[in-house]
A protein has these predicted regions:
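Glycine-rich phosphate-binding loops of nucleotide-dependent enzymes
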Residues: 2-287
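Long, low-complexity, intrinsically disordered segments
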Residues: 286-308
Length: 308
């Protein structure tokens, strides 16, 4: 009889401990710790320039870390290429998706990995497989022969996720998959992130939107200027706290005061100041309602992954 390891007690699929990356004398990433296990979603949040892209490149094998450790299933690694990461089951779905808009869905699904029957492509098998794999992810397209460019942004993201899963991904790195999508299409992508999680995959979800991260995430890492502001499990942080840290917290209040002081110069500035005042007030109310003291910016009281 075979037994399946409990994902809560198994060795994480990916773990970084105190990882960093220097480009010469420039520190791009410093002291970052995270992990993702099977059937888990780890969300990495940060504004532009926070270090999210550098982190992705380290995990995906594009760049090598210069400090700390990077482990895959407990084994220290330092990938020399994305192919090495892919061979270990780590696949990245980038924002540009690497699809050809005028080609049909099934052709994009197998692009570069075509099924062959002798010297020719086995088109029937590729159509059939693409259709079934998409259905398994809950994606029911009208016709896999339609050009992928006719799909919505959310549907294209989901095809890319299903493609990565089909070709052996055990860890999915999703590079801001909801960044350019509306509310409805973002919901579609979040639904398929949950589908991937339920199939036992580990997901690293890169985003700048805590409202997208919190409903699907199990762990949360916030980056700012290449450093970690904190690393929490879901029961250790609230949506309000994540939003406050992402919004800048004290920086937002300082901006509010600056706008108030400049408000006498025009009604437009006064209106902007009022909006910021309302946002700051809502954050404070939400934090008090959560019954906890919000984590202070720059203080990481839970830097390392806690043992079960």
């Amino acid at each position: 009889m075979t037994t399946t390891a409990d994902p809560k007690t198994a060795v994480p699929l990916v773990r970084l401990t105190d990882a960093g990356k220097n480009y010469g004398n420039i520190i791009a990433l410093q002291g970052v710790t995270l992990e993702v296990g099977g059937s888990e979603v780890t969300c990495v949040l940060g504004d532009n320039g926070a270090g999210k892209s550098t982190l992705i490149k380290i995990i995906a094998g594009l760049h090598q870390h210069t400090h700390g450790t990077y482990e895959v299933e407990g084994e220290p690694v330092q990938f020399a290429s994305p192919r090495e990461a892919l061979d270990r089951g780590i696949a990245t779905v980038y924002q540009d998706l690497a699809v050809v808009p005028l080609m049909p869905v099934w052709r994009n699904f197998f692009l570069g990995n075509e099924i062959r029957k002798g010297p020719a492509m086995d088109i029937a098998a590729m159509r059939r497989t693409a259709k079934q794999e998409l259905l398994d992810m809950g994606i029911d397209l009208r016709d896999v022969d339609q050009p992928i460019g006719t799909l919505s942004g959310g549907e294209r993201q989901c095809v890319a996720i299903a493609r990565a899963v089909h070709f052996g991904a055990r860890v999915l790195i999703l590079d801001e998959p909801t960044a350019a999508l509306g509310v409805k299409q973002s919901g579609v992508v979040l639904r398929y992130i949950i589908q991937a999680k339920e199939r036992g995959l580990g997901v690293i979800f890169i985003t700048h939107n805590p409202h997208h991260a919190y409903p699907v995430g199990d762990r949360f890492l916030i980056l700012k200027r290449g450093r970690s502001l904190g690393y929490w499990k879901k029961d250790e942080v609230s949506m309000a706290e994540l939003t406050g840290l992402m919004a800048g917290g004290s920086e937002l209040e300082e901006l509010t005061h600056e706008l108030e002081q400049a408000g006498g110069e025009g009604s437009g500035l006064r209106e902007v100041a009022q909006v910021f005042e309302q946002e700051v007030a809502e954050l404070h109310v939400a934090e008090l309602g959560a019954g906890r003291t919000p984590p202070s910016e720059g203080t990481d009281t839970r830097q390392g992954p806690t043992e079960p």
